[in-house]
């Protein structure tokens, strides 16, 4: 780990006047459907299974959505994964229709990579605070001020922001890609998550200008409270997503993407884990490691209250009813301008090609041969 990271400024881009508002969050929570009873859930799942077969469709779900949807995806030959795994699965699957259970940028990414396919979502209003906090016009203006820098954006962005970028990354491959770019002597603009950008900057020593976005879920984890919880459970392994603040990341025994955290929970011999990410991941952790204990990391400080309480309200908007509606009506379809999609595909495909190269072992990642 390199601790002498170089940045042009501490935090470079002042927070623009479009932070995710409490009103937007309340509106999202208001749209979250009640959990159906067992009989209703079973009926909906049977109907959706028939519709998926009829429409030659496949369900692609994120780890953070309702466990009922995660299970349905696996039962029907679909995918449950992080955003990189979802993108790769959708691009490689032969289905005519992709039903993406996640947030809007995930549906857009699927459409960018598979413009010939129909991409449906349970709810088109399922947004992401990182996407909302990085409007294309403001981000492009920031990039225009630094034309000598390579633009790297997190996957949690709109198609328009991706089209402005040179590279798209997910948390699964961000460190490797930034290390590779640093080895080439490139200076970077990073957006939109400031915590992930700061973590990558400290780990790689890359010269990065950081946009000031954050995830409403991970931004709420508290280092002081996590330290106290860790003291109560000294035998617990702390799993931290790098969208969390530095004070939280520094307490992590494992820091990484949802897939990396899941793998650690399953493969490590310890029996107790403190989890600092969206608690939707606990469903798969408990399925794959039923003999282990998982404890939620604290999200609010003393006397404080949480906005998300470690659950993304937009992820929670995905429902079995929404999936059925999308498949029966053909609505909630992701539509993108062709030229915009083509421009956004270049940096997104660059990431997928790089990740494939890492798996083959033929990409130099800046830290030695992969």
From Swiss-Prot:
Q: Which residues bind [4Fe-4S] cluster?
A: 128, 215, 312
Q: Where is this protein found?
A: Cytoplasm
Q: Name the cofactor(s) required for activity, per the record.
A: [4Fe-4S] cluster
Has UniProt tagged this entry with the keyword Iron?
A: yes
Q: Which GO terms describe its molecular function?
A: 4 iron, 4 sulfur cluster binding; metal ion binding; quinolinate synthetase A activity
Q: What does this protein do?
A: Catalyzes the condensation of iminoaspartate with dihydroxyacetone phosphate to form quinolinate.
GO terms in the biological process aspect are: 'de novo' NAD biosynthetic process from L-aspartate
Which source organism does the UniProt entry give? Answer: Neisseria meningitidis serogroup C / serotype 2a (strain ATCC 700532 / DSM 15464 / FAM18)
The UniProt catalytic activity note for this protein reads: iminosuccinate + dihydroxyacetone phosphate = quinolinate + phosphate + 2 H2O + H(+)
Q: Which UniProt keywords are present, listed alphabetically?
A: 4Fe-4S, Cytoplasm, Iron, Iron-sulfur, Metal-binding, Pyridine nucleotide biosynthesis, Transferase
A Pfam family the protein falls into:
NadA
Q: What is its EC number?
A: 2.5.1.72
- The UniProt transmembrane annotation reads none
- Note accompanying the cofactor annotation: Binds 1 [4Fe-4S] cluster per subunit.
GO cellular-component term (any): cytosol
Q: What is this protein called?
A: Quinolinate synthase
Q: Does ATP-binding appear among the keywords? A: no
